[in-house]
Amino acid sequence: MFYWILLALAIATEITGTLSMKWASVGNGNAGFILMLVMITLSYIFLSFAVKKIALGVAYALWEGIGILFITIFSVLLFDEALSTMKIAGLLTLVAGIVLIKSGTRKPGKPVKEAARATI
């Protein structure tokens, strides 16, 4: 469970970092760029710890997919970016992919011990 929390933190900091990049690009201050640098750095640190126990493909797909989903939603809400029918279809496909990836994730089973063999 701890590693899933780390993955959630990686996703949240990625979203914050990417949104602050946009905020800095439309504003006049450097605070947005500094916030972006800190958040993206933290995101990769959290992700690197999360993949110790979560399969890399699953962690990366969830990190990137959920990040794209929320970045798009917040971009529409905060920066008045357009949300076309094609973007909505893409986001729905993305959500379906995230669900499929997560549902296909299983905990590894316990290793099976080999029977003792006599050596000759």
Swiss-Prot record:
The alphabetical list of record keywords is:
Cell inner membrane, Cell membrane, Membrane, Transmembrane, Transmembrane helix, Transport
GO CC: one term?
plasma membrane
Q: Where in the cell is the protein located?
A: Cell inner membrane
Pfam families of this UniProt entry?
Multi_Drug_Res
| Gene Ontology biological-process entries | glycine betaine transport
Keyword Membrane assigned to the entry: answer is yes
Please give the subunit comment from the record: Forms a complex with MdtI.
- Family of this protein: Belongs to the drug/metabolite transporter (DMT) superfamily. Small multidrug resistance (SMR) (TC 2.A.7.1) family. MdtJ subfamily.
The task this protein performs is described as: Catalyzes the excretion of spermidine.
- Protein's name in the database: Spermidine export protein MdtJ
The record lists the organism as Salmonella agona (strain SL483)
